[in-house]
């Protein structure tokens, strides 16, 4: 008499069609992005300070306005970037077609190039594409999406509005002694913030997968 079959459980990495390397890369990328978001949230200043009406005044000169922008960005940079990110998200949500194109482009880069195992060539319609051909197709697709559709103009116009808003707020908000000395040693600049947080977080996960694609 045959023994009864016992129920078995399957871990997520053992699901049919699941790629452990892909799942691991996605987990690393997601964890680093979440860590970056938490770090940015921890760096954010109280929003009441950002909109304190008593701290606003007209700058007496252009040099003073420039100095205010630099100091305010150094202090409120996490708040500013959060607001610009929200503005970008809202702009994309109000343009579903642009959001679909941008999401499809990002997914193509992730799943067809960065997270695709190096020993599994891309096959479409029975044709095998090399890494160089795949990279060329993705680059061409990026150019088409960014410069021949509404995605590029939408992103650039939204960023321009966000940066203009940051500049106006920074120029008219008089810096307070509370944070002048505290932030004097911190280098100002949008690229420095992204390089130390978001770029390092996403690049670390993507670079690990991309380096595995280099064939001897």
UniProtKB/Swiss-Prot annotation:
Taxonomic superkingdom: Eukaryota
GO cellular component: endoplasmic reticulum; endoplasmic reticulum membrane; Golgi apparatus
GO biological process, one term: vesicle-mediated transport
Modification type N-acetylalanine: residues: 2
Keyword flag Hydrolase: no
Location relative to the cell: Endoplasmic reticulum membrane
Topological category with respect to the lipid bilayer: Multi-pass membrane protein
Keywords: Acetylation, Endoplasmic reticulum, Membrane, Transmembrane, Transmembrane helix, Transport
Alphabetized PANTHER family for the sequence: PRA1 FAMILY PROTEIN B6, PRENYLATED RAB ACCEPTOR 1-RELATED
Purpose of the protein: May be involved in both secretory and endocytic intracellular trafficking in the endosomal/prevacuolar compartments.
Protein name according to UniProt: PRA1 family protein B6
Lineage: Eukaryota, Viridiplantae, Streptophyta, Embryophyta, Tracheophyta
């Amino acid at each position: 008499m045959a023994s009864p079959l016992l129920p078995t459980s399957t871990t997520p990495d053992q699901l049919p069609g699941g790629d452990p390397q892909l799942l691991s890369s996605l987990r690393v990328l997601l964890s680093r992005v979440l860590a970056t978001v938490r770090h940015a949230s921890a760096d954010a200043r109280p929003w009441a300070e950002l909109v304190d009406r008593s701290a606003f005044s007209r700058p007496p000169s252009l040099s003073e306005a420039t100095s205010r922008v630099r100091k305010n960005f150094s202090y409120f940079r996490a708040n500013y970037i959060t607001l610009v990110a929200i503005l970008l998200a809202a702009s994309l949500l109000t343009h579903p077609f642009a959001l679909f194109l941008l999401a499809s482009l990002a997914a193509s880069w992730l799943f067809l190039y960065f997270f695709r195992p190096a020993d599994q060539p891309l096959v479409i319609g029975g044709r095998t594409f090399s890494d160089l051909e795949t990279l060329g197709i993705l680059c061409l697709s990026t150019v088409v999406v960014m410069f021949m559709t509404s995605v590029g103009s939408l992103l650039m116009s939204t960023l321009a509005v966000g940066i203009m808003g940051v500049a106006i707020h920074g120029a008219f908000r008089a810096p307070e002694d509370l944070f002048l000395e505290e932030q004097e040693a911190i280098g100002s600049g949008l690229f420095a913030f992204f390089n130390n947080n978001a770029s390092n977080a996403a690049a670390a996960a993507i670079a690990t997968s991309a380096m595995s694609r280099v064939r001897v």
